[in-house]
Amino acid sequence: MTRPDPHTSGNHRTAGTPEVPERLDITRATLDDWAVISGWAAEEGWNPGLADARSFFAQDPDGFFVGRIDGEPVSAISVVNYGDDYAFLGFYLVRSDLRGRGYGIATWKAGLAHAGGRTVGLDGVPAQQDNYRKSGFELAHTTVRYAGVPQAPRPAEGDPAPGTVIPVSEAGGLKSIALYDSACYPAERPRFLASWLAGDGHRALARVVDGRVTGYGVIRPGRETFRVGPLFADTPQGARALFDALLATVGRAPVAVDVPESNPAAVALAEAYGLTPGFATARMYTGPVRPFAQERIFGITTFELG
């Protein structure tokens, strides 16, 4: 997710903004650096997963940048590459007491350079859409975080949909899940999934019909609540079966799921469980992305990596 302060990104092309402000040193970040940046994200209310960073770095360890003044972190951004055609931007942050000094835009430029000629996606707060457009991003859809203690929904009408929800390890493992995921995301991401499905505290389940994977989901502990993502399924009934099973693994504790408003069935699912809409983000891209099954997306993976 990106939630830059307006002073750091209010106009990406402001005359007089230095390319790199004096004393700012922008370098690639380490996992230890990212523990600090994740703390900033938590302060912004993003509720990052407790073990997210390791999976993020597994996809592209060179895609994380930190700006320092006298050795102290003051700014950050991630631009994670997926193959040759797609990248995703997140964690665009400047330390709250140092905003308005040009550190944000300098870090932004350093991060975007890592993407090369790839199409870049991001999830940014709607208030910053005009700023992102100035850097070539165009709106695709809005995503809303739904959160709360899940309530038991009314029973679904009609006969139960066929299928079984099982651990992903019993559903063909990484190979089967990566194949299904590739139809639901703008790029293939097996390195990320290998870590995400097996992350500390992560519970990953698949829905199988006649031996074929028809959806999968992951729930993981966050700083404030459990986080569900991704939640991908062929049908609303399948998504509901997966969501129920994921919730059961944490005793129906408070959860959050990031729901694309471009899929009305996903919104209906979150509302059926009594979850409350919170802040929204704008999914934006700098260019075309390969077609993917947006109707299968009932919860995105993360705001930070798409």
Residue ranges and their predicted role:
Residues 66, 72-80, 87-93, 206, ...:
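Conserved beta-strand in the GNAT
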Residues 131-137, 270:
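Conserved active-site tyrosine of GNAT-family acetyltransferases
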Residues 81, 119-123, 138-152, 277-289:
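Conserved catalytic-core motifs of GNAT/GCN5-like acyltransferases
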Residues 2-31, 149-171:
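Conserved N-terminal entry element of GNAT/NAT acetyltransferase domains
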Residues 35, 137-227, 237:
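Amide-forming acyltransferase catalytic core, primarily the GNAT-like/NAT-type
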Residues 49, 54-75, 86-88, 142, ...:
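A short helix-loop-beta-strand connector motif used in the catalytic cores of GNAT acetyltransferases and
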Residues 94, 100-113, 236-248, 268:
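Conserved acetyl-CoA-binding loop-helix of GNAT-fold acetyltransferases
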Residues 114-126, 251-261, 281:
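Conserved GNAT acetyl-CoA-binding A-motif
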